[in-house]
Amino acid sequence: MLLTTSRKPSQRTRSFSQRLSRIMGWRYINRGKMSLRDVLIEARGPVAVVSERHGNPARITFLDERGGERGYILFNPSFEMKKPELADKAVRVSSCPPGSEGLCNLMGLEVDESSSRDAWSIRTDEEYAWVMELMDARGTPAGFKLLIRDFRVGE
């Protein structure tokens, strides 16, 4: 998966995108004035585009290799300035609660209930539909969360 931003992103959106790409093991490119078509050619596969609202990252749109929308996630980010201490890329999720399977599929996460390190934890919340929290190499919260308001998965 290739991760990029919408055009003219804020520093906070660029920083979030770079950090998410490192955590997930995705390739990241600075979009600049590149068209979405050029991004798809560069990617040669699926693409995730981070968009912003009021200068903050707020949406990740997932595109297939032809540019068709696979789905999107609306979220509020929550991350500390320190980088998470991970031994490996976080491509596993310790649990995928009922109703969040599409979210796991969009992000390309493998469900492994035995993993508690370098993995995501997904849970429900009173204020948000879902909270995706990254667990570090020690199995403790790494200071990186996606507070998910909504997500949609295409057919």
Swiss-Prot record:
Name the source organism.
Methanothermobacter thermautotrophicus (strain ATCC 29096 / DSM 1053 / JCM 10044 / NBRC 100330 / Delta H)
Taking every annotated instance into account, which residue ranges of this chain make up the domain Brix? 1-155
Give the stretches traversing the membrane: none
- GO MF annotation terms: rRNA binding
UniProt keyword Ribosomal protein, yes or no = no
Q: Which InterPro entries match?
A: Brix (IPR007109), Brix_dom_Rbsml_bgen_prot (IPR023548)
Signal peptide bounds? none
Q: What is this protein called?
A: Probable Brix domain-containing ribosomal biogenesis protein
